[in-house]
């Protein structure tokens, strides 16, 4: 499994594809950044749960996807904003409200990876990683 240069875009694509295929979970290589993002998505109810496994000194993550009672994916859209080729930084005042506030933004800040409402409350901006709704 080759790591792409943009592991966040890869994470979002893998979740998107797994949801389309109605899979229960998706396995991928672990990174601290990926786990931070997944933790936020789980906290907001977009993912069911996740596990981190270690085999032969290689860490992988298993992300369990979340579906509604009628088996529709809870996540409608995952959008990568900042990219390695074009970084996007926003001050606290410019953190977007996503999908009538039903979605979330995820930022990398000086205080770690935060969702938009937390960053806004702390009055800190950062790199706008992705939007989820």
From Swiss-Prot:
Spell out where the chain crosses the membrane. none
Q: Which Gene3D superfamilies match?
A: 3.30.1370.30, 3.30.1490.10
GO terms in the biological process aspect are: translation
Q: Which GO terms describe its molecular function?
A: rRNA binding; structural constituent of ribosome
Which SUPFAM superfamilies does this entry report, sorted A to Z?
A: Ribosomal protein S8
Family from the record: Belongs to the universal ribosomal protein uS8 family.
Kindly give the PANTHER family that the UniProt entry links to this protein: 40S RIBOSOMAL PROTEIN S15A
SUBUNIT field:
Part of the 30S ribosomal subunit. Contacts proteins S5 and S12.
Give the protein's recorded name: Small ribosomal subunit protein uS8
The species this protein was found in: Chlamydia felis (strain Fe/C-56)
Q: Upper lineage ranks? A: Bacteria, Pseudomonadati, Chlamydiota, Chlamydiia, Chlamydiales
Q: Which gene encodes it?
A: rpsH
